[in-house]
Amino acid sequence: MLMLLVRGTHYENLRPKVVLPTPLVGRSTETFVSEFPGPDTGIRWRRSDEALRVNVGGVRRQLSARALARFPGTRLGRLQAAASEEQARRLCDDYDEAAREFYFDRHPGFFLGLLHFYRTGHLHVLDELCVFAFGQEADYWGLGENALAACCRARYLERRLTQPHAWDEDSDTPSSVDPCPDEISDVQRELARYGAARCGRLRRRLWLTMENPGYSLPSKLFSCVSISVVLASIAAMCIHSLPEYQAREAAAAVAAVAAGRSPEGVRDDPVLRRLEYFCIAWFSFEVSSRLLLAPSTRNFFCHPLNLIDIVSVLPFYLTLLAGVALGDQGGKEFGHLGKVVQVFRLMRIFRVLKLARHSTGLRSLGATLKHSYREVGILLLYLAVGVSVFSGVAYTAEKEEDVGFNTIPACWWWGTVSMTTVGYGDVVPVTVAGKLAASGCILGGILVVALPITIIFNKFSHFYRRQKALEAAVRNSNHREFEDLLSSVDGVSEASLETSRETSQEGRSADLESQAPSEPPHPQMY
């Protein structure tokens, strides 16, 4: 039912209030808002020219409808044009009906830049936000790259492309080596698995003792013993290659094969053999203990250091299996068995990689190679191109001199040695043209190798400092937080750690909001 308000007639208590569809003669048009619009009235829930009150992370401002109407595609522009309160609530995080204020749980610093955008139509990059956080905020408020000012657009695009590797050029940045809280949280989550496990408290202590050399005095002693065994195994392998041991074992092997017996029982020196058995027993103890104490079996087999431990003992057991398989097939098969055993013995060299568990530098080197595959690929490409070019030139200049440059593939060795500036001197050019080609090859190698090596070195420095910082953070966390867990009940669950993690994140968000710019006593109009 349509009701009209006539001049001189007061209907203050009449509900619902409605919009006057046709202005009276002699009166200016005025729009009134219905407090309780009916379902069929089609009346807007707020005036179209009403200022928009917003609260972004504690910063309160008022934006005029005229400023928002210039950018109807943005989030605030769509909020201003919302036809109903339900539609408006979908665009904000909360709405205060009493104050008619919209709340957004977003970065307050970016919001101040957003206000500047509504005034000028240009968005400027904020140095206080990383490029990805800035992009997320811009996407949330409905701004694209076209909204960026011309003075900031090129810089933003450049930072977005170089941000993942920004520490390559500025590796001395303190924040670049700070350990990520998620990395420490992953360790805590792994240890939380012991809460529901059998003998979880004891297993947790033993696991920290074996995995973290700085956890306690027993862990330091265990690390020293492990390093000593690895070094003893490597020393025994090197001593075994000395000529006197080779001659003695070769004579014993010939006698054993002639007698139709396996040469494996007499080839090794008794002292070296006992030392090898002791090292194998220790390595097997380490692998089995870590497997039994690991919080997650799947993660155990995915860890590179654990795979190195398995490879270090695998040749010994493969040799035993080969001896059992061929032990009853006569002396003729012992020759084939010897070749297999030699291959397995060669795999013992991987034991030196066990030192990576106790060396921050080796772990940093592995991380560097893992994250430098692009640079390594570029280096190999440069070397391949240079070797191919200079090998062809050297072959053309030296093929008539009979000094080792007979074919282009034969010149590849010379090109590789020259470009890497090693210079063995086994093959050298003798003609003037060949020497000029060699000079160009050496100079080109210096330039080509130096370019990627600098980037790889910066990455190694970054990962080394980051690894040291992470170890210190985890060690401090172990001594403080994990000791509290150990002294408490064993019913520590992953859910409790997730709750604590969310609490810490909320605390960080609160700190961020507390750092927001101070707001004026009353909302300002834009």
Curated annotation (Swiss-Prot):
Intramembrane feature ranges: 409-420, 421-428
Localization per Swiss-Prot or TrEMBL: Cell membrane
Keywords: Cell membrane, Ion channel, Ion transport, Membrane, Potassium, Potassium channel, Potassium transport, Transmembrane, Transmembrane helix, Transport, Voltage-gated channel
Annotated region (Disordered), positions in chain: 491-526
Signal peptide feature range: none
Comp. bias intervals (Basic and acidic residues): 499-511
Membrane association type: Multi-pass membrane protein
Ranges in the topological domain labelled Extracellular: 240-270, 323-337, 396-408, 429-435
GO biological process, one term: potassium ion transport
Keyword Zinc-finger: no
Function summary: Potassium channel regulatory subunit that modulate the delayed rectifier voltage-gated potassium channel activity of KCNB1 and KCNB2 by altering their kinetics, expression levels, and shifting the half-inactivation potential to more polarized values. While it does not form functional channels on its own, it can form functional heterotetrameric channels with KCNB1 and KCNB2. Each regulatory subunit has unique regulatory properties that can lead to extensive inhibition, significant changes in kinetics, and/or substantial shifts in the voltage dependencies of the inactivation process.
Family to which the UniProt record says this protein belongs: Belongs to the potassium channel family. S (TC 1.A.1.2) subfamily. Kv9.1/KCNS1 sub-subfamily.
Subunit structure comment from the entry: Heterotetramer with KCNB1. Heterotetramer with KCNB2. Does not form homomultimers.
Domain notes: The transmembrane segment S4 functions as a voltage-sensor and is characterized by a series of positively charged amino acids at every third position. Channel opening and closing is effected by a conformation change that affects the position and orientation of the voltage-sensor paddle formed by S3 and S4 within the membrane. A transmembrane electric field that is positive inside would push the positively charged S4 segment outwards, thereby opening the pore, while a field that is negative inside would pull the S4 segment inwards and close the pore.
Name of the protein in its database record: Delayed-rectifier potassium channel regulatory subunit KCNS1
Organism of this sequence: Pongo abelii
Gene: KCNS1
